[in-house]
């Protein structure tokens, strides 16, 4: 697992946003993985996720505070979190500023429809060229259809590891575009769910807020974060 930490973007959030905007301006193709402990745990058991993390073309950013803490325990200088939902928000802002195009893929039908309505209102210069909920059967065909539209931004909200695999396996179909797997961000961006209060965000305890709101997350948290911590402690520094 230690090799994964060598792949983490470590220039800080401001530099990342500058590079993100420049990529959007210049029509580069970029695949951003928002890594948390669960991502790295999947990488240990899933060959595709392993390849995604280690692929030098993939931009791996430290989404979870567990990744930041573990990085520093292992001697890597990771400055701060770069949350996936904040990346999605920045892309909406930059896309609006630069009059770019976007495609939304994922979440429940009512959620993505509400998101589209909100984005049209809040980001009038950002052109939505399509959207699809996450409950369609042939997702690769949807990606093929999206590639023909050639959007500047593609946000995929299917949850790990499905969103990362889908993007990675279909990336060659696209000539340009910024691709990000954003998990449950559509729920928050659409207004269907509230993000954690600022005190949780500031103290890097959004994970705790999610568990309080959804206790069923405890098992998932244990299987990813707690087991991840045990693995990190066994790694030679």
What are these regions (language model features)?
Residues 1-80:
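N-terminal nucleotide/polyanion-binding subdomain common to many enzyme families
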Residues 66-71, 195-237:
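A transmembrane-helix-recognition feature enriched in membrane-embedded lipid enzymes
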Residues 41, 112-113, 139-140, 163-167:
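Short, well-ordered alpha-helical microsegments
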């Amino acid at each position: 697992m230690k090799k994964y930490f060598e792949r983490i973007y470590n220039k800080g959030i401001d530099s990342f946003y500058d590079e993100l905007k420049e990529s959007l301006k210049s029509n580069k193709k970029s695949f951003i993985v928002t890594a948390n402990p669960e991502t790295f745990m999947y990488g240990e058991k899933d060959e595709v996720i392993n390849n995604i993390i280690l692929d030098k073309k993939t931009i791996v950013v430290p989404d979870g505070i567990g990744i930041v803490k573990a990085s520093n325990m292992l001697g890597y200088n990771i400055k701060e979190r770069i949350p996936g939902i904040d990346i999605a928000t920045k892309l909406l802002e930059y896309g609006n500023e630069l009059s770019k195009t976007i495609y939304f893929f994922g979440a429940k039908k009512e959620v993505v429809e509400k998101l589209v309505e909100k984005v049209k209102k809040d980001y009038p210069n950002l052109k939505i060229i399509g959207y699809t909920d996450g409950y369609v059967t042939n997702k690769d065909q949807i990606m093929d259809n999206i590639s023909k539209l050639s959007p500047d931004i593609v946000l995929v909200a299917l949850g790990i590891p499905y969103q990362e695999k889908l993007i990675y396996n279909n990336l060659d179909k696209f000539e340009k575009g910024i691709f990000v797997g954003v998990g449950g961000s559509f729920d928050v961006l659409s207004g269907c769910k509230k993000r954690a209060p600022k005190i949780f965000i500031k103290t890097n305890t959004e994970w705790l807020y999610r568990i309080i709101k959804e206790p069923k997350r405890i098992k998932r948290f244990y299987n990813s974060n707690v087991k991840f911590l045990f693995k990190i402690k066994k790694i030679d520094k």
